[in-house]
A protein has these predicted regions:
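Active-site beta-loop-alpha junctions enriched in small/polar residues
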Residues: 138, 174-179
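A cross-domain feature marking catalytic cores of carbohydrate-active enzymes
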Residues: 77, 171-173
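N-terminal metal-binding scaffold of metallo-dependent hydrolase/deaminase domains
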Residues: 16-57, 67
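Short, intrinsically disordered, charge-balanced linker/junction segments flanking boundaries
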Residues: 15, 180-182
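Short hydrophobic transmembrane-like helices used for membrane targeting/insertion
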Residues: 1-3, 18
């Protein structure tokens, strides 16, 4: 599967000065049982404005070999958990022991480090064909527990990270008030 289209379409979306760009896909999956051949996709100001099946490429179309398909959506992400990779799988741990390193990482994040970590996470998603993410957002305070002057400081870092990676994000604001089941 050619995920290049997701990047090219995202590129066209970011280039708001570009009024119209047309792509011609050798094959496109349109939700049916099989892919459709020779699909022309028109993009205007970052939005798909037309899709034509079974047509030949026209002069100026950007040709895409292989199969294109709509971008995937990751509807459940905790971007900062990327920092846990390789740190929680040793021994016979369980969910409760896993929380300790998770809290340690969460308590060390600043808007800058959170943004960098999220940008790397979102870039990996984009490289996998994900074009939208639902990010569970529950880190709102400074390392010492005090509020930021701007209460959305950490959220703004997440928004900037998703824009930097070129994927859309729904910031799912979560109130994490209790860390136990009882």
């Amino acid at each position: 599967i050619n995920v290049e289209c997701a990047f090219r379409c995202a590129k066209a979306e970011r280039l708001q000065t570009m009024t119209t760009q047309n792509f011609h896909a050798q094959w496109a999956w349109r939700g049916a049982e099989s892919a459709v051949a020779n699909v022309r996709i028109g993009v205007s100001n970052g939005l798909i404005t037309s899709v034509e099946d079974g047509v030949e490429a026209q002069a100026g179309d950007e040709r895409i070999a292989g199969v294109v398909m709509p971008g995937f959506v990751n509807a459940h992400s905790h971007a900062f958990h990327r920092a846990l990779r390789g740190r929680t799988h040793g021994g016979a741990g369980d969910f409760w022991s896993w929380r300790t390193p998770m809290y340690e990482i969460a308590n060390r994040l600043t808007p800058e480090t959170y943004g960098e970590l999220a940008a790397m996470t979102f870039a990996e998603m984009a490289l996998s064909g994900i074009t939208g993410v639902g990010e569970f957002h529950y880190i709102h305070h400074q390392q010492d527990g005090t509020r930021y002057v701007n209460p959305n400081e950490m959220g703004l870092a997440m928004v900037a990270a998703s824009q930097r990676a070129g994927i859309r994000m729904a910031l799912l604001d979560v109130a994490y008030l209790h860390a136990a089941l009882d």
